[in-house]
Amino acid sequence: MKKQHNYTVMHWGTWQVESREGEIVAVKPVPWDKSPSRIGQSLPDAVTSQTRIRRPAVRAGYLQHGPASREGRGKEPFVEVSWEVALDLLARELRSVKARCGNEAIYGGSYGWASAGRFHHAQSQLHRFLKGFGGYTASTNTYSSAAGERILPHILGPLSPLHRQHTHFSELARECQLFVAIGGLPLRNAQVNGGGANDHMLQYWLDKMQANGTRFINISPVRNDLSAVPDAEWLAIRPGTDTALLLALSYVLIAESLYDQAFVASHTVGFAPYRAYLLGEHDGVAKTPAWAAAITGLDAQRIADLAREMARHRTMVNISWSIQRARQGEQAYWATVALTALLGQLGTPGGGLGFGYACTNLAGAVRKAFSGPRLPAGENAVDSVIPVARLSDMLLHPGETYEFDGQQRRYPDIRLVYWAGGNAFHHHQDLNRLCEAWRRPETVVVHEQYWTAQAKFSDIVLPATTSLEREDIGSGGHDGFMIAMSAQIPPVGEARDDYAIFCDLADRLGFGEAFSEGRDAGQWLRHLYEESRPRAQEEGIALPSFDDFWQQGVLEYSAPERPQIFLADFRADPERYPLSTPSGKIELFSATVAGFGYRECPGHPWWDEQEAARQRQEAARWPLHLLSSQPRARLHSQYDHGSVSRATKVQGREPLWMHPSDAQARDIREGSVVKVYNDRGAILAGVHLSEQILPGVVQMSTGAWYDPLDPKEERSLDKHGNPNVLTEDRGSSRLGQGCSAQSCWVEIAPWREELPPITAFDPPRFIEV
C-alpha cells in the first residue's frame, strides 16, 4: 500500500515520524496528545543501533550438537546462518517434539507486550501458528495483576471488564470529594495502554479534580507515587501492610455504625461472618486502628479519622495493581471491595471503587469502544495451561501437581519453548532460578528485534521487524482512536515480519494455506479492518472504507453522551443487573473460596499473622524492603537501550532510591554505585537519595536488561541492576499463583571495586563453523 502519512503507534503513544535514507531522524508526538510520553524519543537511536539483530543466528553448541548441548544456553557464542538453514532447523525440531512428546510439550505462552499494531502483534501470530500446528501449552493471567484477576471473579466480577468500566474522570471531577489512592497514582504507569496510548489524560483530569476541590490521600511508602498532585496528603505506610489498614477502616465503620446498612443488606452477602472477624470474635483480636497502627506504622488516630472522613464525603477508593503483586496480594483487593461496600457508595457519581486508575492510560478514560481489528487465533487443541508466573516451576518440576484457584493441576513436560514479543528475563522473578530452569527444555526459540538477555539465552534467534518497518493498524479499542501505521523505513538487515516467518514455517510443516488463508500482510489488514466495521456499527460507530481510512490515517470516535459510572446499574437494581458472582452480589464472605480449604485464603479478607511473622524473620536478615516499580523511561524492558532510558542511569546502572538515613548508616552517597543483595543474588545499582521514600524502604524500576558479570558462573553478579535477580519466585497464594515481587528484602553496601563495563546492549560473540 502506498504510504500516505507518517504515523506510527507504540504502547506509549502515537507519533509522527521523520525518516531519511533508511534511518529514523526524528519523532514528534501527535498534536492531540495532552501529555506525551518521552519514551518515543528513544526510537531514532535505538532502531538501527548495534543492539539490533540483523541475521538469523543459532547458538554454536546447538548448531553442532542439537538439544544435547542445552547447558551452553546463555554462555556460548552464536553462528549467523541463512533463513533457509534457520527455518529448516526449527521445522525439524518442531516435528520432532510433536512426534515424540505431543503438542503439550511445546510452551507458547510467550508473555509480553509486543507491539501496538493489531495484525503484527507477535503473540497473536505465534498463537495462531501453534494452534495450526496442533496446539501448545499456554499461560493464563498476567504478571501485572494475577492475584486480583483470580480473587475478583469470586467476590465482584472479572478484573479485565471491570478495568474498562471504571467511573469516568469527568464524573470524578464533578462529584468526587475525597480520592484515596492506595499505592498512589503514578504518572509513569499511565504512559501506556495495550494497542496504543493516543491521548495521555491522567494529569489533565487530576488537575480538573483538584480545581474542583477533590482532596487526595496517597497511601504508599513512596510520596512521589502521587507526584501529579503535589498537595496530596501522604500516609507513609509500611509495604505489604495495606490489608491491615483496610481491615481497621472497616472496623471503624462497623463499630461506629457509619456503614451503609441498607446497601450492605441489599447488595452484599456474608456480612455477619466478616463483622465477627473484624470485631475479634474469631481470634480474640479486634482489628482496631491501634492494632493496625502497630502493623502499618501509621497513626491510630489518623486511621480512625480517615474512616470517618470516607463515610462523610463522596469517596473514591482506588487500589493499584502493585499492591496485589505480593504474598497474599488477593487479601488487599478483597478488603478494598469490602470497605467500599460498607461505605455504600458503589455506583454513585464520583464515589466507589477503582482497581487501576493510573495503572494504564485506560481506566477512567474509556471513550466509545468496540472490538477492533483482530487476527483470528483459532482453537487450541491442547488444554494444558499454567499460571503465567509459574514459568520456572513448570520447567523445573515437570509432572508435579500444584493447586490453583480451587483446582489441582499438573505441570507439563516442556521440551520446546517458543517466544515472540516478550522478555521472560524481565518479567519473571528470581532470574538466577530462571537461568537454571531455562536450560531444561531441549530447544528455545525466540523472535526478537534486539539482543536482549532472552535472545542471548536462546538456541534459535530469528530477527523480526519493528513497527517502524511494517504496515499495521493501531487500535487500543477503547480510547476512541484508530491509526493507520505506515512503514517508515525498510527492514533492518535481514529482519522479517513475524507473519512472514510463520508463513514460511507453516509451509514447511504442511499447513501454510490454512495459516495464511491465501493473504499477504496487506490483504490481511484490509480484511481485518473490513471485518471490524459491522462490530463498530453495533456500537454506533460508522467506519469509512479501508481505502478512505488508509488515506486519512487517523479515525477518532466521539465520546459517549453519558459518562460511565462503575456499577451504576447494579446499584439501581441488583436483581435486574446482578454481578457474575455465585450470589449475584458482592461477597464479603465467599463460600466458594472458603470451600477451597486454603489456610492462606479463608472465606473473607483477613490478616495472616503467620505470614507476617515469616516476613519479619526475613526483614531481620535483610533489613531493607525493596519495591520494584514500573519504569518512567521505558515500557517494562522495551527500549532500555534507547537514549531516554540510558539517560536515567547512574554511572550506567539502574537507579535505586533510598532514604538519606538508610544511606548514612551504610556510608552511601548520592550518585554512588552500590551492591544490592540477598540470598537469591546480587546486583549493582546507582543511588539517588530522597526523603520522599519511607526509611527502611528502597525502590528500583523493573526492566533493566539483565547483564551477568560472568554468564558461565552460576548466580553471577548482575552489573546493570535488574531487581528481579533479587525478587522471590513464589506464588501470591494457592488461589491466585500470581507474582509476589513486592515481598522482597535486601541489604545494600557500597561498591568499592572497579566498576565492570555494561555489556547488556552488546551483541553476543559470533563465530563461524
Model-derived regions, located:
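Active-site phosphate/pyrophosphate-binding segments
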Residues: 249, 270-397
